[in-house]
A protein has these predicted regions:
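Sec-dependent N-terminal signal peptides
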Residues: 4-14
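Central antiparallel beta-sheet cores of small beta-barrel/beta-sandwich binding domains
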Residues: 18-120
């Protein structure tokens, strides 16, 4: 009985840790910057594969590329103009994701800190 209960609890915790589908909002702050940039991210999950879109608001969204989830780690990329955005995030609770963002263009590279909350 104890073994069965332990397995059920582990499966439930594993399923919860992997559930990132939905709308997320928050900001990213570029290193050395003095303000935060808003973000709205819509994640669609199929197993460990992520698709969806991200951008500064609901009207300006860019498709997510190379999205995946491994445990509580969430990674994806997107392109906006000459900029390539590479997100490396981690679940910080059921309704919170935090991590880092690398922004690259031909002549520039920046890093940012990302903080997102699930929209209800």
């Amino acid at each position: 009985m104890k073994t069965t209960l332990a397995i059920v609890v582990l499966l439930a915790v594993g399923a919860l840790a992997g559930d990132v589908a939905g709308k997320w909002s928050g900001t990213f702050r570029v290193s050395g910057g003095d303000h935060s940039i808003p973000q709205i991210i819509v994640l669609k999950q199929d197993g460990n594969r992520l698709t969806g879109s991200a951008g500064p608001d609901a009207g300006e969204q860019y498709p997510i590329e190379n999205g995946k989830i491994e445990g509580d780690r969430v990674t994806f990329e997107l392109t906006s103009g000459e900029w390539r955005f590479s997100y490396d995030l981690k679940r910080a609770g059921a309704d919170e994701i935090k991590g880092n963002l690398e922004l690259k263009s031909v002549n520039n590279r920046r890093t940012a800190v990302v903080s997102l909350s699930r929209m209800k």
